[in-house]
């Protein structure tokens, strides 16, 4: 509802603008303009130059619009606005604005979608998914640089000479480094040749796995068997020695035993004789007694 209705007047531009310190003074003429009349003076407005920060924002917005290119991409079943915005580094609002989408579900009514990307960005190089939307002119064929054969040969020889010089310098530097390192550290062992295996010097004492197996077999089987066989042979030899000693003692004592038995028999036989005869017999048997 309109509160007050009054006569409408056309836009009247200022007649002059005066700039002062920190402000602008606009002066208008007192003349009245007809309601139905329209002249070009209504649109002849002086262009005011914006100041520092505003001018930078305007330039940035213009550059932003100029650096954006629209690329077209086919829509699949799994696509949505958030996924496309994250994938191509743009805003959902920009995609909606370019494709005239009102809601997020409107994307499924399209077969292809336009995506705003930077002109010289990495996404513009993905030609397998995106195609230029506003490129009406056919791409210009790449111009092949054709150099004369003599110049190409000269360049080839030149680059080969450079490569050879670099290789020689690298070899000399390597030799000098090895010599200086050998002079600075004479006590260090020589460098290990590639492919040559050196024994380890850790907690395993540098032994191999088959050495460990051999030591376990030696300690667990060979030494116990040798110990048992040795003491068994020692026991057999001691038993044989004791039996032989007993046999020798009995053999050495057998003559004396026989002599004693013969003396007893003679004593029993001569028990009926006289004591003098027995004494004579005893003296004959024991001349030293």
Curated annotation (Swiss-Prot):
The record ties this protein, via InterPro entries, to:
LYSM1-4 (IPR045030), LysM_dom (IPR018392), LysM_dom_sf (IPR036779)
Q: What organism does this protein naturally occur in? A: Xenopus laevis
| Residue span(s) of domain LysM | 71-115
Glycosylation site list: 30, 59, 134, 178
Q: Where, in residue ranges, is this chain on the Extracellular side? A: 1-208
Question: Which stretches are Cytoplasmic in the membrane topology?
Answer: 230-289
Please give the Gene3D superfamilies that the UniProt record associates with this protein: LysM domain (3.10.350.10)
Keywords, A to Z, come to:
Glycoprotein, Membrane, Transmembrane, Transmembrane helix
Q: Where is the signal peptide?
A: none
Compartments (UniProt record): Membrane
Question: What membrane topology term does the record carry?
Answer: Single-pass membrane protein
Q: Where are the transmembrane segments?
A: 209-229
Per the record, the domain of life is Eukaryota
Name the GO cellular-component terms: membrane
Compositional bias annotation for Polar residues: 9-23
UniProt-recorded name of the protein: LysM and putative peptidoglycan-binding domain-containing protein 4
Keyword Transport appears in the UniProt entry: no
């Amino acid at each position: 509802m309109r509160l007050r209705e009054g006569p409408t007047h056309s836009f009247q531009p200022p007649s002059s603008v005066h700039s002062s310190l920190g402000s602008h003074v606009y002066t208008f003429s007192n003349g009245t303009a007809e309601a139905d009349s329209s002249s070009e003076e209504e649109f002849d407005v002086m262009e005011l130059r914006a100041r520092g920060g505003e001018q930078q924002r305007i330039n940035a917005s213009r550059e932003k619009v100029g650096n954006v290119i629209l690329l077209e991409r086919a829509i699949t079943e799994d696509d949505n606005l958030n996924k496309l915005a994250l994938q191509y580094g743009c805003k959902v609002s920009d995609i909606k604005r370019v494709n005239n989408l009102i809601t997020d579900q409107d994307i499924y009514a399209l077969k292809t979608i336009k995506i705003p990307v930077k002109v010289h960005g990495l996404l513009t190089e993905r030609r397998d998914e995106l195609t230029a939307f506003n490129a009406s002119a056919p791409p210009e064929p790449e111009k092949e640089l054709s150099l004369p054969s003599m110049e190409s040969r000269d360049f080839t020889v030149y680059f080969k000479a450079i490569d050879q010089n670099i290789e020689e310098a690298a070899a000399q530097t390597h030799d000098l480094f090895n010599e200086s390192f050998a002079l600075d550290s004479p006590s260090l062992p020589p460098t290990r040749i590639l492919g040559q295996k050196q024994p380890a010097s850790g907690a395993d004492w540098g032994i191999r796995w088959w050495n460990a197996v051999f030591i376990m077999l030696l300690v667990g089987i060979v030494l116990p068997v040798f110990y048992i066989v040795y003491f068994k042979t020692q026991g057999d030899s001691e038993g044989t020695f004791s039996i032989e000693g007993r046999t020798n003692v009995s053999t050495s004592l057998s003559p004396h035993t026989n002599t004693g038995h013969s003396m007893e028999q003679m004593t029993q036989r001569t028990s009926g004789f006289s004591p003098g005869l027995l004494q004579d017999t005893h003296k004959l048997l024991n001349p030293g007694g």
